[in-house]
Design a protein with these regions (language model features):
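Short Gly/Thr/Asp-enriched flexible loops that form oxyanion-binding sites at enzyme active sites
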Residues: 80-105, 123-124, 283-292
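A contiguous, well-structured pocket-lining segment that forms one wall/lid of small-molecule binding clefts
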Residues: 192-273, 282-296, 323-326
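Conserved phosphate-binding/catalytic loops in two-lobed NTP-binding clefts
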Residues: 110-111, 243, 273, 290-315
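Short beta-strand scaffold segments in enzyme catalytic cores
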Residues: 17-22, 139, 147-151
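Glycine-rich phosphate-binding loop plus the immediately following alpha-helix
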Residues: 115, 153-198, 221, 225-229
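Conserved phosphate-binding catalytic cores of ATP/NTP-utilizing and phosphoryl-transfer enzymes
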Residues: 1-3, 111-137, 318
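N-terminal beta-alpha supersecondary unit
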Residues: 4-84, 113
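Glycine-rich phosphate-binding/hydrolytic loop that grips phosphoryl groups
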Residues: 117-119, 303-342
Length: 342
């Protein structure tokens, strides 16, 4: 009789402490503690994030194991985010994973955070509509720290076709939200306001970058200069037009993302297209995916909202596949704040 494989996944790359347990690749539990402390600072404060991870990691892991209905001694391996991310945050998860695995005498599995996002569609949470994309497929990975188009041939065979040469789409949204005085994180706020606004009300600069690479620094600069000019003319401009501003900003960013993705589909002839990362929760981007599916015959794969942001389930599913291939890491494996994709 084949022994069941239980993987504990741990994610701590930024400001979410998360732990998940998977049994034979099926998700049993996924527990996440988010950090509201950063909101008043307008962004993640690394030192505060690290301290919060230290407070949260033990109870979060214990709760994940409890909800999974197993004993820790049943675990087969511990998978953890090795990078990229904030070094102080990563070290908390990395060191806990090492100590926990060593105490149980089980293997360690290091996981690239970006690889985890790419594999989010392979998280089987027991849903009736579980439908992972067939290989190969294209994945738009878009978050606060990354904007990439990835060709996925297998969990351990991915090719970056294009990526941002400066700022990420999620970072641009957060910075523009801050300029408007809307608070942090900006993504959900811009998304909510955009649903009530006119996406063609204002025009912002779009980059002209060859190939499949992205750039969002010019958009941020254009947005800032326009806001300054309009506020000088009318101090209440943002308050009176925030819905239209948000809708126009969202439309511009989505348009930039989709133009490059459409080009990638044309170049590769791959029409199975997925989206992942925190920005994939954006309503405008999701609508654009459905629209392109109808217009161009794509088959699109959009993750559950709970799998769009940082979570340990995505680390656990990569860990499961690596366990099957016996791809374990050494106890001395360091964390990396910056790391190549795979």
């Amino acid at each position: 009789m084949t022994k069941d494989i239980y993987i504990l996944g741990i994610e701590s790359s930024c400001d979410d402490t998360s732990a998940a347990v998977l049994k034979n690749g099926v998700l049993l539990s996924n527990v996440t503690a988010s950090q509201a402390v950063h909101e008043s600072y307008g962004g993640v404060v690394p030192e505060l994030a690290s301290r919060a991870h230290q407070q949260n990691v033990v109870p979060v892991v214990h709760e994940a194991i409890k909800r999974a209905g197993i004993q820790k001694e049943q675990l087969s391996a511990v998978a953890f985010t090795r990078g990229p991310g904030l070094m102080g945050s990563l070290l908390v998860g990395v060191n806990f994973a090492k100590g926990f695995a060593r105490s149980l005498g089980i293997p360690l599995i290091d996981v690239n955070h970006l690889q985890g996002h790419v594999m989010a569609h392979f998280i089987d949470g027991g849903e009736v509509d579980f439908n992972p994309p067939p290989l190969p497929f294209l994945r738009l990975l878009v978050s606060g720290g990354n904007s990439q188009i990835v060709k996925v041939n297998a969990y351990n065979d991915m090719e970056v076709l294009g990526q941002t040469i400066d700022d990420a789409a999620g970072e641009a949204i957060d910075k523009c939200s801050k300029v408007m005085g809307l608070g942090y994180p900006g993504g959900p706020i811009i998304d909510r306001l955009a649903r009530q606004g006119n996406p063609k009300a204002y025009q912002f600069s779009e980059p002209h970058i060859p190939g499949l690479d992205y750039s969002f620094s010019g958009l941020k600069t254009s947005f800032l200069y326009n806001m300054r000019k309009w506020v000088e003319e009318d101090p209440d401009f943002i308050e009176h037009h925030k819905e239209d501003i948000a809708a126009s900003l969202e439309w511009t960013i989505v348009d930039i993302l989709m133009k490059k993705l459409k080009l990638a589909v044309k170049q590769t002839s791959i029409k199975h297209v997925a989206v992942a990362g925190g920005v994939s929760a954006n309503n405008g981007l999701r609508n654009a995916f459905h629209d392109h599916a109808k217009r161009y015959g794509w088959t699109v794969y959009i993750p559950k909202f709970s799998y769009t942001t940082d979570n340990a389930a995505m680390i656990g599913i990569v860990g499961y596949y690596k366990f099957l291939d016996k791809e374990f890491c050494d106890i001395n494996a360091p964390a990396f704040s910056k790391v190549t994709f795979c």
